[in-house]
């Protein structure tokens, strides 16, 4: 029908330059350029206090902004949250130097024990819930 063609046509329009500039400016500020409380600064503070939950939370936010910038630079619509590195490699003509290497170094934590650890965490929660405690 017409509604599908309308959606397809709207997607085929040129990437708005103002949107591109705003995405880049806002997310660069969040990454490190903000005078205080940038993701970089928050990660640094979390590292100094050895707060691994906060480190991972802030790294996730950092990565979201990082990919927002990459897709804006390449004038691509954001594909969602899964396999962003592969999507970027396959579809972006402009990528940061050491793109894969830096991501792999940053996110090296997941390993063969990750699923076992998650299973243990869930089972521990179940034990608490089974005993009638509330989280």
Protein language model features and the residues they cover:
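Short, charged amphipathic alpha-helical segments flanked by flexible coils
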Residues: 75-104
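Amphipathic alpha-helix face/heptad-repeat signature
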Residues: 27-32, 58-59, 117, 121
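Long, charge-rich low-complexity segments
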Residues: 101-135
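Charged/polar positions within long, soluble alpha-helices
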Residues: 48, 67-78, 82, 130
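Conserved NTP/Mg2+-binding pocket subregion across the NTase superfamily
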Residues: 1-47
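Small-residue-rich helix-loop
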Residues: 58-65, 86-87
